[in-house]
């Protein structure tokens, strides 16, 4: 067990050891309680056959290729350029470009041209059928209303988000209150295939209450009755997820439709 909130020197050493064993696969995180992580031996929860399988990435190049594919798959599409989506990979620009070249030549990723964008995006070949289905309008998926967590893979590359949707998002949790444009913990609002605004929900788990401090819609969005109902339904779903009751209604501001809906 280690407690993330304890920064004494003795706990830093134990934390480093536990995290290294976790990275090596010797330990896994069994559960968390607040800021405390409880570890256990991986062999107590995973089969011996799985633990003894050979490494699927026998060399550094194959490991880099796997990590690039994993990031592309998590976001859906990514470009081969400097991006926050590559944070933590420890790759140079040359290494990243070499990995993209190998993956494209081997048919594991495909370049996609997006209207009004000069830089191509790359998608996993296995996701191409889904892209074709959506592009051709053959999907039976229903439009959804969701609040995106600030660290959701869809938001990893905020320059890409702005290029695709014209939506500029900044996570202001570390921004001094006097300098925030919106709120402490705002979440982008996904409505169908559009990012239409930001919402700031606050959950008081001790009191079991979730409230909404504010909603900011994009300039071209008018909160129609249908939209307001979708927002309120999503807020109530978020409250249930957090084990809270919702005490503040999201009142429709007017009965207009979203422009260009």
Predicted features, each with a name:
Residues 1-146, 152-155, 160, 167-171, ...:
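Long, low-complexity intrinsically disordered regions
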């Amino acid at each position: 067990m280690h407690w993330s909130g304890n920064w004494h020197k003795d706990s830093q050493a134990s934390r480093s050891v536990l995290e290294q064993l976790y990275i090596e696969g010797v330990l896994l995180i069994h559960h968390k309680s607040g800021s405390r992580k409880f570890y256990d031996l991986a062999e107590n929860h995973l089969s011996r056959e799985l633990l003894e399988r050979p490494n699927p990435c026998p060399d550094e190049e194959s490991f880099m290729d796997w990590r690039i594919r994993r990031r592309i798959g998590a976001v859906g599409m990514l470009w081969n350029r400097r991006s926050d989506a590559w944070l933590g990979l420890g790759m140079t620009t040359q290494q990243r470009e070499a990995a993209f070249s190998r993956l494209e030549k081997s048919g594991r990723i495909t370049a996609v041209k997006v209207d009004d964008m000069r830089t191509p995006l790359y998608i996993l070949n296995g996701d191409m059928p889904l892209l074709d289905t959506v592009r051709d309008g053959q999907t039976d998926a229903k439009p959804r209303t969701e609040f995106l967590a600030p660290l959701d893979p869809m938001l990893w590359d905020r320059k890409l988000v702005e290029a695709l949707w014209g939506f500029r998002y900044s996570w202001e949790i570390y921004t001094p209150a006097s300098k925030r444009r919106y709120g402490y913990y705002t979440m982008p609002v996904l409505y169908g295939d559009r990012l239409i605004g930001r919402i700031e929900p606050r959950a008081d788990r001790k009191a079991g209450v979730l409230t909404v401090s504010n909603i900011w819609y994009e300039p071209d969005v008018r909160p129609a009755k249908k939209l307001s109902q979708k927002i309120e339904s999503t807020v109530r779903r978020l409250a249930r997820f957090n084990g809270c009751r919702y005490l503040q209604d999201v009142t429709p501001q007017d009965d207009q439709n979203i422009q260009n809906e």
